[in-house]
Amino acid sequence: MRVPTIAARGLLIGVLLLPAAAGAAEIKVMISGGFSAAYQKLVPEFERATGHKVTTVRGASMGETPQAIPNRLARGEDADVVIMVGYALGGLIEQGKVRPESRVDLAWSRIALAVRAGAPKPDISSVENFRQALLAAKSIAYSDSASGMYLSSELFRRIGVYDRIKDKARKISGEPVGRVVARGEAEIGFQPISELRPVEGIDIVGPIPDELQIVNVFAAGLASNAKEADAGKALIAFLVSPAARPAILASGMEFADAARK
């Protein structure tokens, strides 16, 4: 990973020293898949710099599985920091589960298409080519989280293929779509590129056409019942510091500030 500049290192030290003075804390984080690749690289750096320990619980940003973050919080599970797709985090803020003033946008990710490693790659360079790729595929997989909801409830209908592909398209719960594609259980699969990139055994064809693309923002906030709020704030500050930028970009995401420009 690229070494942060002197200015970035200085900012990182300033961000991290303040909470460290209060003593090491154990921070409980609930996180969905989209930001996980960058998060996994960054958390050890944060722990070394502060002495804090981060415990991670994973779940989808939405959906019916018990592991989904909204369902965990609804049944009273504790958390300090919540990291998930932005509009789902907004829903938790409306429900009083996340502190509204604590929300910070971390990064943006685009939906991409993947095939099993070595398989032919369909042409998705235009809307019509993308449409034909969907019709030609023998099986299609999409996630049960934000990107999959967009595909199944809006995009497939908008381009006029829903009725023709609904019997061969499958919503995947509880594991990355890429793993299903890697096992050969789906010919093509869709998920944010940051969730596809860590999966072995697949080839990422590329993002879906810009005209059809939805860019998911991933955001962080403090849970309303956070027991380690100060340490949680320090973690969030680190995740949006210049020191975090290389890991975010390497995961296939766009740094939130850059994406807004």
Which sequence ranges carry the predicted segments?
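Phosphate-/polyanion-interacting regions in eukaryotic proteins
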Residues: I83
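Absolute N-terminal positional cue centered near the fourth residue
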Residues: V3-P4, P19-A21
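Bacterial N-terminal signal peptides that target proteins for export
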Residues: M1-L11
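Bacterial N-terminal signal peptides
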Residues: R9-P19
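Exported/periplasmic ABC-transporter solute-binding proteins
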Residues: A24-Q67, N71-D78, Y87-Q95, R99-P100, ...
